[in-house]
């Protein structure tokens, strides 16, 4: 019923996602500890950019953000029985092999932001296969979107999710534990033009890498 009109029921679907994330994590003994560099006014929209080393990163950000938001992610997430529920309703699938798909996805993201909803985008675009993981180069899309909408970016450092659950637990298994998430100060984009997108991308990458490396991924 909710899926028939996701726009109308956006808030309720987002709450269901949050409840599922909390219950599923609690059931397997995975908890999240959030550390804020500065208080966040969640009544405003943001583009949330985090490093991506584990599927648990998704749950971490679901539990972090109390306001309505959408993920943008690879189109394959439509085929997952859990993420598929939300990528068919409130989240935004992206097929990077199709310019039309990419245009439509970022148009939806733009609309969301202008409605006051945040966007969560993993700027690396994928989880790497190397173990231990490292921070890959960032895609330009989130940063161009932030400039076009003049919405602040919140850099997020997810320190140790990969140590608890990596590679779908095929190689090293999984274990209970506490995932440490660092919420950095929002980066204001007001006054920036698209000519600043590359610099903004590199600044966010360096910031996340600095804090992740400093903590040793712990």
Task: Kindly give the residue locations of the regions a language model identified.
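Catalytic core of membrane glycerolipid acyltransferases/transacylases, capturing the structured
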Residues: 1-16, 42-99
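N-terminal nucleotide/polyanion-binding subdomain common to many enzyme families
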Residues: 16-22
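A short, well-structured juxtamembrane/interface segment
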Residues: 23-46
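Short gly/ser/thr-rich secondary-structure transition/capping motifs
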Residues: 27-35, 102-103, 163-166
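A generic structural signal for alpha->beta connector loops
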Residues: 29-31, 68, 90, 150
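Generic preference for hydrophobic
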Residues: 34, 48, 71, 121, ...
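Non-catalytic C-terminal accessory region of glycerolipid acyltransferases
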Residues: 104-218
């Amino acid at each position: 019923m909710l899926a028939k009109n996701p726009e109308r029921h956006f808030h309720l679907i987002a709450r269901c996602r949050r409840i599922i994330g909390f219950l599923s994590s609690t059931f397997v003994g995975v908890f999240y500890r959030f550390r804020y560099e500065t208080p966040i006014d969640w009544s405003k929209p943001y583009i949330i950019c985090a490093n991506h080393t584990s599927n648990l990163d998704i749950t971490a950000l679901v539990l972090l953000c109390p306001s309505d938001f959408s993920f943008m992610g690879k189109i394959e997430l439509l085929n997952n029985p859990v993420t598929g529920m939300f990528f068919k309703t409130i989240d935004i699938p992206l097929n990077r092999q199709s310019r039309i798909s990419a245009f439509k996805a970022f148009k939806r993201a733009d609309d969301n932001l202008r409605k006051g909803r945040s966007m969560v985008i993993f700027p690396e675009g994928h989880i790497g296969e190397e173990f231990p993981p490292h921070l890959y180069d960032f895609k330009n899309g989130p940063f161009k979107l932030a400039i076009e909408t003049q919405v602040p970016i919140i850099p997020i450092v997810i320190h140790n999710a990969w140590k608890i659950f990596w590679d779908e637990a095929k190689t090293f298994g999984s274990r209970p534990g506490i995932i440490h998430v660092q919420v950095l100060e929002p980066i204001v984009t007001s006054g920036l033009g698209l000519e600043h997108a590359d610099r903004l991308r590199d600044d966010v990458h360096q910031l996340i890498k600095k804090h992740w490396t400093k903590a040793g991924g712990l």
